A protein has these predicted regions:
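N-terminal leader/targeting and accessory segments in enzymes
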Residues: 1-95
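Residue-level signature of catalytic and energy-coupling elements of molecular machines
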Residues: 10, 62, 147, 188, ...
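Phosphate-binding loop of NTP-binding sites
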Residues: 11-12, 92-225, 229-239
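A structural micro-motif
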Residues: 16, 68, 81, 106, ...
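Structural signal for conserved beta-strand scaffold positions within catalytic alpha/beta enzyme cores
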Residues: 20, 47, 72, 85-86, ...
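Thr-Gly-centered strand-to-loop micro-motif
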Residues: 34-35, 47-49, 72, 136-138, ...
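Short, charged/polar "capping" segments at the starts of alpha-helices
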Residues: 75-79, 228-232, 251
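Adenine nucleotide phosphate-binding catalytic loops in nucleotide-utilizing enzymes
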Residues: 201-202, 235, 239-280
Length: 280
């Protein structure tokens, strides 16, 4: 069950107007969905207006299926269920995700980069799962709708969130990172993806590092020191980032790298707290 997220809280977080009975205003939702085919009893339905479909046409259907309430960008008139009218469903779902994550007060590892985000997310989550209850991004739910939906999967028992953030244009990272507000930020590399919007690799660097504007105080920043663009980042929040790579001058580096074929890649990892061998 989601933690203490009442319809009253939702209306305030979304800057929306609540319509419905006072009794239901204090009820907590069980989940949030944008997919009318995946409605759960007690959930909040968020109708997204897309290029090919308008989620508003499914509102009556999902309410009959047991949804507790719905958002709506337009007045619904006299209806027998509670709803919250908002200016934009997409903006509302982002605002609500930021509010919900803030209420949970759990550490967030935010991961971005041109390539390798998903593999890095999986490895970080696998390590953390040895000791903590971890929620991680599933599939490619790393954009302005996918990230909020990932956040809504968090439950009270979760101890750490590992969130992937993918972008294709300037400003997107600002919007994603304002939701995630990472305690730890990892950037894998600066490549040549989305140059149609970002221009060149310097543009990619600028867009990716928008994340720095939304880090929690005293956040840890971990960068690929072998990347010629990321190594130019000398300071974040007044502190030097932690670099990793193949250079033994970095605090975290790998050597003795050897392919084991289908069994993976063997290497030796050097850290400030010791050296160990792994097969990935």
């Amino acid at each position: 069950m989601m933690k203490n997220l009442t319809l009253e809280h939702i209306a305030a977080a979304c800057h929306g107007t609540y319509y419905g009975s006072e009794e239901k205003k204090s009820q907590c939702i069980e989940a949030v969905t944008t997919d009318s085919r995946k409605v759960e009893r007690g959930c909040l339905f968020v109708p997204i207006v897309g290029a090919r479909a308008d989620g508003h046409k499914f509102i009556d259907q999902v309410m009959k299926q047991g949804a507790l309430a719905t958002l709506s960008e337009r007045p619904l008139g006299e209806v027998d269920f509670p709803y919250i009218q908002v200016e934009s469903s997409l903006q509302a779902v982002k605002d609500l995700a930021a509010y919900y994550l803030e209420q949970l007060q759990i550490p967030v590892v935010g991961i971005t980069g041109s390539v390798g985000k998903t593999s890095t997310k999986e490895m970080i989550a696998a390590v953390l799962e040895q000791k903590f209850q971890v929620l991680k991004t599933l599939g490619n739910f790393n954009n302005e709708l996918g990230l909020p939906l990932t956040v809504f999967r968090l439950r009270e028992e979760d101890e750490i969130a590992v969130l992937e953030m993918g972008i294709s244009d300037f400003g997107e990272m600002h919007r994603l990172a304002s939701i995630a507000q990472p305690n730890t930020c990892v950037i894998t590399n600066i490549g040549t993806c989305h140059l149609e919007n970002l221009g060149d690799r310097d543009g990619v660097l600028k867009a990716k590092t928008e994340v720095f504007d939304h880090l929690k105080p005293d956040a840890t920043v971990i960068l690929n020191g072998d990347d010629d663009k990321l190594v130019t980042v000398k300071e974040v929040q007044g502190r030097r980032p932690i670099y990793f790579g193949l250079n033994e001058e970095f605090p975290l580096y790998a050597d003795e790298i050897e392919s084991k074929g289908l069994k993976g890649i063997a290497c030796r990892i050097h850290t400030p707290k010791g050296t160990f061998s792994v097969v990935v």
